[in-house]
Amino acid sequence: MCLIDSVHARQILDSRGTPTVEVEVTLEDGSMGRSAVPSGASTGAFEAHELRDQDNNEYLGKGVTRAVRSVNSEIAPVLIGFDAFDQVGLDHRMIELDGTNNKSRLGANAILGVSLASASAAARAADLSLFRYLGGPSSRILPVPMMNIINGGAHADTGVDIQEFMILPVGARSFSESLRWGCEVYHSLKVQLRESGLSSGLGDEGGFAPALRSNRTALDLILSAIEKAGFSPGIDIVLALDIAASEFCKAPGHYRFEGKDITSDELISYYEGLLSSYPLVSIEDPLDQDDWEGYRTLTTHIGDRVQIVGDDLFVTNTSRLSRGIQSGVANSILVKVNQIGTLTETFDAVDMAAKGGYTAVLSHRSGETEDTTIADMAVATNCGQIKTGAPARGERIAKYNQLLRIEEKLGRSARYAGWLSYPRWQGK
């Protein structure tokens, strides 16, 4: 037992210059954990509620002093004296204190900050690395980095509809080698963009945001960059997409995509064409978050060939994930801690996915900080996949550097997930 001595929150800035919540939890033995809460740009309608001030006189209404007050005035008095090793009890106490079904009274950003900082403090008190404290002795799988090297959609001011174009160095022998491969392709792409007279400016997640003619143009550029860096597409490095289709859904079952009005069925046919042309192993949010029938059709058509990831569809919520599993919708869940608001509920979603035969992908948000908790969580859960942006921008690199440290600490017991994370892909 190690009791909580103090809980303190403050307002800091994220990678977009937008306020977010940082929390410090100190235990009676002096152990201190700190956590900063991320925030998304394209957010699912069913995510837990992020409490903001709505005061247009400060930070354009995006301040988080109300969430900070929730921590310092309401949560802290309830948790002082609580056993930090009882993560489940701690999280449930905050959920009960909030009293809503989406954490809208205290704010999911307030509750999550305390949840993560408490776990960090407890790990220090136990003299364990965070990944080991959270996952136990079996935690040793280093995830495949899903590197977002071209940004479109809501993450960039360009005409490209698809939000993220990712490279996955699945053929590497270790995480450190996969990171090197990804960096080499990233820099190869930068040279190629400049030689083509295209912008090499960066989007929110560190990927390039050039003005391109089409989504296929982006994919072709990436394949060329992979080859020029000395790697083989489909063998060394494969591709993944985050479509973020809810961003261009205009009505149920209807989308505005590449300048045309199309139906769910037409969009599904488009994806089938991509699968036949490119080494794609994963497609995230290919349809609107409410298009369950479309998702069922999509999963029936291509679910045996590609990972179909639900982000806005599932929002790290076990109720929505359970519906998806029972309905045969998608086959993977994107896991974002701030979508649900506590560490316990996040791990519940990962566990449910595994039991249902679904994969899980640990993910950052477009508004990030130097906090590296998700890197530890990826190893703790042995999920085998992580999305944390391009190999650029300090808040993204922080997660990659933490994974390098974890791999070094694990030594010979470390295992890189590689191809094992994508058993459905048939192009090997």
UniProtKB/Swiss-Prot annotation:
PROSITE patterns: ENOLASE. This is Enolase. It is found in: Cytoplasm; Secreted; Cell surface. Keywords: Cytoplasm, Glycolysis, Lyase, Magnesium, Metal-binding, Secreted. SUPFAM superfamilies: Enolase C-terminal domain-like (SSF51604), Enolase N-terminal domain-like (SSF54826). Belongs to the enolase family. The active site is at E205 (proton donor), K336 (proton acceptor). (2R)-2-phosphoglycerate binds at Q163, K336, R365, S366, K387. Pfam families: Enolase_C, Enolase_N. Pathway: Carbohydrate degradation; glycolysis; pyruvate from D-glyceraldehyde 3-phosphate: step 4/5. Catalyzes the reversible conversion of 2-phosphoglycerate (2-PG) into phosphoenolpyruvate (PEP). It is essential for the degradation of carbohydrates via glycolysis. PANTHER family: ENOLASE (PTHR11902:SF1). The keyword Magnesium applies. CDD domains: enolase. Coiled coil: none annotated. It is an enzyme of class 4 (lyase).
